A protein has these predicted regions:
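Small/polar-rich, solvent-exposed N-terminal microdomains that initiate assembly or binding
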Residues: 1-54, 88-113
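Short amphipathic alpha-helices in soluble, non-transmembrane regions
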Residues: 13, 77-85
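Ser/Thr- (and often Asn-) enriched beta-sheet segments in non-cytosolic proteins
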Residues: 25-27, 118-123, 139
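Generic structural motif
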Residues: 31-33, 46-48, 69-71, 127, ...
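A broad, low-specificity signal marking well-ordered, structured residues that form hydrophobic/aromatic
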Residues: 40-41, 62, 117, 138
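Short, solvent-exposed beta-strand/turn "edge" segments of beta-rich domains on protein surfaces
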Residues: 51-57, 128-131
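Oligomerization/assembly interface segments of phage tail-like spikes and tubes
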Residues: 56-75, 79, 133-144
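Low-complexity, intrinsically disordered Gly/Pro/Thr-rich segments
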Residues: 113-129
């Protein structure tokens, strides 16, 4: 897998999930250590289970770590995201890295689709507590299809 494809997968996952829950604060593969938000979501990606030289890894996963100071808000966010996963089927992977914006005066150009992430399953963790946040993780397993 190329670095560009990996970044496109990250960006596509974030665009998909943040579009399904747009009122939250999102972090990709990191979080703000000085967070003050009442709730936020970390999107963490993992690659490397069954490598193929020509394609992306099979059965990779992403983890959505949902943090909230309110358990009812946590449950609402989890419900919204799991509904988005169950209804997704496949998530399009767009070329965000290689995108060139149009010149001034030219009409906008859509991002090119380079493949899709076929969701095979997801797992929902039990609720835990970190600092003063209630936390649950959604682990989504997928395969990249060209």
């Amino acid at each position: 897998m190329t670095a560009a494809l990996y970044r496109n997968i990250q960006a596509s996952l974030r665009m998909y999930f943040s579009g399904k829950y747009s009122s939250g604060t999102w972090y990709i593969d990191r979080k703000n250590e000085n967070m003050t938000e009442d709730s936020f979501i970390e999107l963490q990606t993992s690659m490397g289970r069954a490598q193929d030289d020509r394609k992306a890894y099979q059965y990779d996963f992403t983890q959505l770590l949902v943090h909230s100071k309110s358990v009812s808000t946590l449950d609402t966010i989890i419900g919204t995201l799991t509904a988005a996963i169950e209804g997704a089927g496949a998530i399009p992977v767009m070329d965000y890295v290689g995108y060139t914006p149009p010149s001034e005066g030219e009409p906008p150009v859509a991002h090119t689709q380079v493949g899709e992430l076929q969701i095979s399953r997801y797992e929902l963790s039990q609720q835990s507590t970190i600092s003063n946040y209630a936390v649950r993780a959604i682990t989504v397993y997928y395969e990249f299809i060209e």
